[in-house]
Amino acid sequence: MSTENRVIDLVVDENVPYGLLMQFMDVDDSVYPSTSKPVDLTDFSLRGSIKSSLEDGAETVASFTTAIVDAAQGVASISLPVSAVTTIASKASKERDRYNPRQRLAGYYDVIITRTAVGSAASSFRIMEGKVYISDGVTQ
């Protein structure tokens, strides 16, 4: 399984839950126009977490709640409840982003997808990775 555009920085809004819905597609570029069909996510699972740095032993700031929403259509989700967003905001850098002063670096994340194959070893792939920013809110 290969992925494109897997480095995606996430911006998590303060004071509200975070969620991301993803659809996995198998794209055939060998024909014109290209065709695509959903990847069947039956027997797949996701896991992901946010750490304060990329160093070994870095603190895990939060773990994503993950779900396969519609296996046949290749739809999955990652989310964070408000309590996790609050923790992320409290541990984010106090230094504001140079280009968007509302944002502060909160850490680094990745999401792993695992296929549990019957009778053989499970295979796992990192499907997403990047930085996590907290976007400071003003409304409580």
Curated annotation (Swiss-Prot):
CC per GO annotation: virus tail, fiber
Chief location: virion
Pfam families: LtfC
Subcellular compartments: Virion
Keywords from the named record: Late protein, Viral tail fiber protein, Viral tail protein, Virion
Disulfide bonds: none
Function: Forms the collar, into which the side tail fiber protein pb1 is anchored.
Subunit structure: Homododecamer. Interacts with baseplate tube protein p140.
The protein's name: Collar protein p132
